Amino acid sequence: KQLASKMAESLLCLAADKQFNACGVCHSCQIMQAGNHPDHLTIRSEEAGKSIKIDQIRALKEKQSLTPSVANWKTVVIESADLMTNSAANSLLKLLEEPQNNTILILTTNAVHRLPVTIRSRCQQMHLSTPDYSMTLKWLDSQGVATDADQLRKISSLTLDAPFAIVNALETNEWQSYQQIQQDFDQLIQQQANPVQLA
């Protein structure tokens, strides 16, 4: 999400350097940092873990019909795009098939396989590798994420050490459900549980 935001900021910057870094001081950068850039839109689920709805994509399409007013580009970041409902994804597909001029759409997801194939086939994909566990720990510490080491190790194994997935798991407590499923599955394999009771 942070990378997507930085990419959008660089695209909208009026004085980006040769390495494509936003200057941080031009008018476009300042209003982007203030969170009210007229040429940028961030779409995310309205509640943690909930779906991105078709009304949000309709609002995006309405906004994208306008020409840029400050920068040379219009940017859209859709966070956790895999949370789109089917109708929202179908609505977005039409925009991807006929993109507006000078418009960049950036979709982020921790689960690209959950995106419809029709969406994936119309996007240029960039896969970010997961950092090693020690780097993840340092980053979590810098973000002020506090939890005991044993709990963190369990969550980390369930989320494949993905830092943002760890934070999301802690915020939503979903990891406890996954841990229970893992324990039930282990008991089934070891024939220590009745499948009917677990169901």
Predicted regions and their residues:
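Charged, glycine-rich active-site and insertion segments that engage polyanionic ligands
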Residues: 1-6, 10, 31, 102-103, ...
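P-loop/Walker A NTP-binding region and its immediately flanking N-terminal helices
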Residues: 1-80, 104
